[in-house]
Amino acid sequence: MKHKQLLIRNAVPVLSWRKAALTDLLTIVEYIADDNPDAAQELKDEIEARASGLVRHPQMYKQGRIAGTREMVVKSNYIVVYAEDYATVYILRVLHAAQQWP
């Protein structure tokens, strides 16, 4: 029985994108794509890759401005706001650094 408990405790969390975060990302990518489609795709790929890495080290980034969240900066201008529990990392928002948050 102890062995099963150890496996559950050491399980890697899953990644869950909230609807608001997906909408944020799409809005950012579409805005950039108007001038530079390649840069938009590169940014999208980087944000998605960095977000995927959060399941391995979810507590790596600083506490967020809202209690219970953390914030990961991507390319100095974008902030991925997320929360985590034992089983899931929730991507809550993807924001430009100039946006008012919260």
Please provide the spans of the model-predicted regions:
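Generic leucine side-chain signal with a strong bias for well-ordered alpha-helical environments
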Residues: 15, 25, 43, 54, ...
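Short, well-structured alpha-helical segments
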Residues: 41-44, 48
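Generic recognition of well-ordered alpha-helical segments
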Residues: 23, 27, 49-52, 56
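Arg/Lys-rich, positively charged N-terminal/basic patches that mediate binding to nucleic acids
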Residues: 1-41
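GIY-YIG nuclease signature motif recognition
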Residues: 21, 47, 82
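Basic/aromatic recognition patch in beta-strand/loop cores that engages polyanionic ligands
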Residues: 56-87
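Conserved amphipathic alpha-helical interaction elements at protein-protein interfaces in regulatory
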Residues: 31-34, 53-56, 60
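Enriched for short, Lys/Arg-rich terminal
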Residues: 6, 78-79, 83-102
